[in-house]
């Protein structure tokens, strides 16, 4: 079946069952096919393909109202030429496309949206803005692929997903973007690779796309998210741009790419993450779901609107630049207090950041949260200390809350009153190095 082959054309198929061996939509022209009202389109040969937008063409396929496509070897959306444009829309409960492989943006521009309960399934792999080696390469062509999965019961399934890159030297640049929002679901039972090779850009968005307003999150079910390719020209970004108060990512994140918390929601990480790129928290909260889930290989930058929340789980970071909030423990009155330690292997810098801690306010031996800096400290930090059930007591040296191994030039000052019983506590520097809580009983009137 060919629609839009060298001349423009369109086709509407309503409530039919049909079987074909292949389809081309928009080859050197504009073409579109719309399936509605539970149409069932079956492909019957091992090499069956659908091409959407090839050469200089523009091809669009709408799969709507419970319609289904199955039996495909491949579905190829935007392929073989820089001006090729392909669009696939799967919309509506039970609307689905199933193929052995799905290729979106291979030397062309491909866009896919899966919404309102639709499903796209690739049985082997899904390439988004990724150029595979094949016989139809055109030299120095760019590739752009974008997939949106949105709304409840909307699902993308693939063993693994590749975003932005190539395994051949005959392309100039590639971009692959995958966004999941508003209860959409991505299932990749092996991994998602974000930014595969040099000159490749890969972006995985939970919630809104980068630069757009935050959206309710979707979910990602994959054991591994790999950020980054083989050299510095690869761009790999994982964006948490959502509004959910309870989004949890269980995947482990590795590679060289960047992690951004940019939405107003709370993202809880619970994988054993080891990525080496920077972590930016500009808005909302990045929260720990277990001990050592924050990557110890990453530089953390917390802006004034962001919160790095250890949530009662001790963590180790490479460096920390704090202009926002770092919250250590999560104590509840009447419960036993377990202290939390934030260890910085490198330097700690602050720009009026807020460090929130809990301490059983008593004598020098009191149990407390602690900040340990192996490198140097600089800048100003406000310290809010909440009492975890202490009754107050005299201190001699004090309760150590900040330990500095390197050059101790940072200033830590008390934020609000720190009180237990008749005692007031102050944040003071001792031995020109570390910071302590020291107690006093204020003089009477």
Segments the model singles out, each with a brief description of its role:
Residues 28, 38, 55, 66, ...:
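Generic structural motif
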Residues 7-9, 16, 21-23, 29-33, ...:
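The right-handed parallel beta-helix/beta-solenoid scaffold, focusing on the short coil/turn
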Residues 81-84, 133-142, 167-173, 198-200, ...:
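Short, solvent-exposed loop/turn segments that connect beta-strands within catalytic domains
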Residues 1-5, 24-26, 48-55, 76-81, ...:
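Extracellular glycan-interaction patches encoded by glycine-rich segments
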Residues 205-207, 213-220, 233-234, 241-242, ...:
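Extracellular beta-solenoid/beta-roll
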